[in-house]
């Protein structure tokens, strides 16, 4: 009886310790953790907890209406890409880092709407990429304190790190630099953050390229005659070409560095040009927003604004963000797509620890 009491007491103590640690108790059998960095494409609600302009928040109706019981701060009618990636990886939804009392056992989401690689991009209105890296460093210290050096190193090396960044940097004037110089500065800052994560133990990276936003509803609404903004798309093309080369260089320079790069830009353009092929009725106008193409960024931000009857029919939920259905489609492609969309590996390969298997197009398998 005394032995049984001691065993029960030990179990209770372990349970109490697990509940008292923000990182919980890691099991050797659990799925790899997921850490997320970037902008509004990946923001789960971090901006709810900073002092910023209403344009950088989405914690009000009708955001979240298609899935969540109340708005969460996601710039969507429902879930976003990281939510689906977590599901496919057998993980719970990864929590916002700035939300109080969250459990970071399975990772953390640092993404912030409006964030850029450059400190000047929406400074004071978003959590920039360098600050996100600093928050990650604080969490790494916490893991080491609670798990010890060996377990924390294992967690960090097994984890996958998602990135969506750069788009906000190209919506501001780049003078006095040339386009090439400006792109090089942006990519240099992104590279420094990736290397910073690598130095703390990260090895597996999932990145999306920057979408061509020049013809999006929110951009056309700002243009004379509601035309497309070709200059921002020129910069974005230069960025995507240069960043692809930089990732190849990092793979050669950094031992153990592997990555999955998803061509989000092409996936979006395909749905804008041929929405019915992908299950949408409208590919150019936003469900939520007033004015031409629903491009005025007033969704939920003023008393009267345009709102469609069925958000799933519109590729764009608001003037700058796709709906939940589109995010699910993108996540599926990112997760197990072939090399036509995700190179040189897909996320499934990274999570399963099989980065030695490269994926060929379906017609070459």
UniProtKB/Swiss-Prot annotation:
Catalytic reaction(s) noted: (Z,S)-pyrethrolone + (1R,3R)-chrysanthemoyl-CoA = pyrethrin I + CoA; (Z,S)-pyrethrolone + (1R,3R)-pyrethroyl-CoA = pyrethrin II + CoA; (Z,S)-jasmololone + (1R,3R)-chrysanthemoyl-CoA = jasmolin I + CoA; (Z,S)-cinerolone + (1R,3R)-chrysanthemoyl-CoA = cinerin I + CoA
Active site annotation, chain numbering: 40, 318, 321
Tissue expression summary: Restricted to the pericarp during achene maturation. Expressed in the leaves of mature plants and seedlings, as well as in buds and flowers. Present in disk florets.
Compartments (UniProt record): Secreted, Extracellular space
pH dependence of activity: Optimum pH is 7.5.
Gene Ontology CC annotations of this record: extracellular space
A GO MF term: serine O-acyltransferase activity
Activity over temperature: Optimum temperature is 25 degrees Celsius.
Pfam families xref list: Lipase_GDSL
Inducers of expression: By wounding.
Biological processes per GO annotation: isoprenoid biosynthetic process; lipid catabolic process; response to wounding
Glycosylated residues (UniProt): 189, 310
Enzyme Commission number, as recorded: 3.1.1.-
Signal peptide boundaries: 1-27
Record's keyword terms, sorted: Glycoprotein, Hydrolase, Lipid degradation, Lipid metabolism, Secreted, Signal
Membrane spanning residue stretches: none
First-tier enzyme category under EC: hydrolase
Keyword tRNA-binding in record: no
Annotated site residue numbers, Transition state stabilizer: 137, 168
Pathway in which this enzyme or protein is active: Isoprenoid biosynthesis
Family assignment from sequence similarity: Belongs to the 'GDSL' lipolytic enzyme family.
Its biological purpose: Component of the monoterpenoid pyrethrins biosynthesis; pyrethrins are widely used plant-derived pesticide. Acyltransferase that catalyzes the esterification of terpene acids and lipid alcohol substrates into pyrethrins; mediates the transfer of a chrysanthemoyl moiety from the coenzyme A (CoA) thio-ester chrysanthemoyl CoA to pyrethrolone, and, to a lower extent, to jasmololone and cinerolone thus producing pyrethrins (e.g. pyrethrin type I). Can also use pyrethroyl CoA as substrate.
Name used for this protein in its record: GDSL lipase
């Amino acid at each position: 009886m005394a032995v049984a009491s001691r065993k029960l007491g030990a179990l209770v103590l372990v349970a109490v310790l697990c509940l008292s640690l923000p990182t919980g108790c890691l099991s050797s059998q659990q799925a790899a953790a997921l850490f997320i960095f970037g902008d509004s494409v990946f923001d789960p609600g971090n901006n709810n907890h900073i002092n910023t302009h209403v344009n950088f928040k989405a914690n009000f109706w009708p955001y979240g209406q298609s899935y969540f019981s109340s708005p969460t701060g996601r710039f969507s009618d429902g879930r976003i890409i990281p939510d689906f990636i977590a599901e496919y990886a057998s993980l719970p939804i990864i929590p916002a880092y700035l939300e109080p009392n969250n459990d970071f056992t399975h990772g953390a989401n640092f993404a912030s709407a409006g964030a850029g690689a450059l400190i000047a991009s929406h400074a004071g209105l978003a959590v920039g990429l360098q600050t996100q890296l600093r928050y990650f460093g604080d969490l790494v210290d916490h893991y080491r304190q609670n798990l010890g050096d060996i377990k924390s190193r294992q967690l960090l090396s097994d984890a996958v790190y998602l990135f969506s960044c750069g788009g906000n940097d190209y919506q501001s004037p780049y003078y006095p630099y040339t386009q090439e110089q400006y792109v090089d500065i942006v990519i240099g800052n992104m590279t420094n953050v990736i290397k910073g994560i690598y130095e703390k133990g990260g090895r597996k990276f999932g990145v999306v390229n920057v979408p061509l936003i020049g013809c999006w509803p929110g951009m056309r609404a700002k243009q004379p005659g509601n035309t497309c903004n070709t200059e921002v798309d020129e910069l974005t093309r230069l960025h995507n070409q240069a960043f692809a080369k930089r990732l190849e260089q990092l793979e050669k320079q950094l031992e153990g560095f592997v990555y999955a790069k998803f061509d989000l830009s092409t996936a979006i353009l395909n749905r804008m040009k041929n929405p019915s092929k992908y299950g949408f009725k409208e590919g150019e106008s936003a469900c939520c927003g007033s004015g031409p193409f629903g491009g005025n960024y007033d969704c939920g931000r003023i008393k009267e604004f345009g709102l469609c009857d069925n958000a799933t029919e519109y590729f764009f939920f608001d003037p700058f963000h796709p709906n939940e259905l589109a995010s699910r489609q993108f996540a599926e492609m990112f997760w197990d797509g072939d090399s036509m969309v995700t190179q040189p590996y897909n996320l499934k390969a990274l999570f399963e620890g099989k980065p030695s298997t490269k994926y060929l197009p379906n017609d070459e398998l």
